[in-house]
Design a protein with these regions (language model features):
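Conserved, structured core segments of small domains
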Residues: 1-114
Length: 114
């Protein structure tokens, strides 16, 4: 079964107020339960802000901060299984509704395991 990465595009403007965040977290909990119950859930996780990032380059150079500067960053991800892109997009719509943020859906390459 194909796997897909769902990435949350989070603005750098800060977190919503506590009441809104409580509602979002409740909606995310319901979405994650629905993903688990359907057998589509593989992994999910929220990320710290871009200021916590460290970039390691092939030449050994290590720098603090995100690789790219921008007004948005990846705030969290899901890895899901879905029979096809349409099914993954349906999960993406649910994720966008739960988070109130844009969700990017990308299929993993179909390569043999190492």
């Amino acid at each position: 079964v194909p796997e897909y990465l769902l990435s949350i595009y989070q603005p750098d403007t800060g977190a919503p107020d506590a009441e809104t965040m409580d509602r979002i977290m409740a909606d995310l909990h319901r979405l994650n339960e629905e993903l688990r119950d359907s057998g589509s859930w593989v992994f999910t996780g929220g990320l710290h802000g871009p200021g916590s990032a460290t970039v390691v380059r092939a030449d050994g150079l290590i720098t603090d901060g995100p690789y790219l500067e921008g007004k948005e960053h990846i705030g969290g991800i899901w890895v899901i299984t879905a029979p096809d892109l349409d099914a993954a997009l349906a999960w993406g719509r649910k994720a966008a509704a739960a988070t109130t943020l844009p969700i990017e859906i990308r299929p993993f390459q179909d390569v043999p395991p190492f």
